[in-house]
Amino acid sequence: NRTVDRVARSNYTQIFGPHAVNMSGTELVISKYGVKAEWPYQLAKRVKEVAISIEQALVYGKVQEDTSGEVRTMGGLIDFITTNVNSSSTTITEALWLDQMQAVFSAGGSVDRILVGAKQKRVISAFTAGLTVNVNLSDRKRGQVVEVLQSDFGQTSILLDRWLRVSDVFGFSRDQAEVKTLRPLQVEPLAKTGDSVKAQVLAEKTLQFERQSHSFRFSALT
């Protein structure tokens, strides 16, 4: 049967932050060794904290409704990918990897992104050495390196992510996952009180993930 009933999936937006920055008038004008200007330096640190929180939530976020005593949180890849989950294998092999690729192909999909941490990247590199067709150095950003592999199921980009657990590997297609923004990452000035300047850094985003049966993950690797 090629007809598949549509299933409505939902997600919540999550507020990342607000992270406050508060500096006195004295701190604003004095010089500090190694820092040209303290205020933009502190703002940049908070922006980076929010960006890292977003990256982590896109993978490991768990859906939580905004109720009394609970903070509304978004679901990440780990919440959406539920069909092709290998929760028994402790070592990823070429055969297991291709089995997952084939399962997605048989379901009508294709995988062109595999998200891995440092240890599993080395394991995959060992058995895919002959499949490497390109290394895109321009995509190195916040610890990510892109390596394109060729297999029976097409080209797949291996994305190295420093925030992934050793146990996990995720496979999906780039047209399945999209980051949706309700409020972009921003710096909001706060009311000045006394001899100080204040601001907060925040963003509000969520993950839209479609056709989860066209993706896979390993969850018990060591």
Per-segment meaning from a language model:
Residues N1-T222:
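Flexible, glycine/threonine- and acidic-rich loop/arm segments that mediate assembly and lattice contacts
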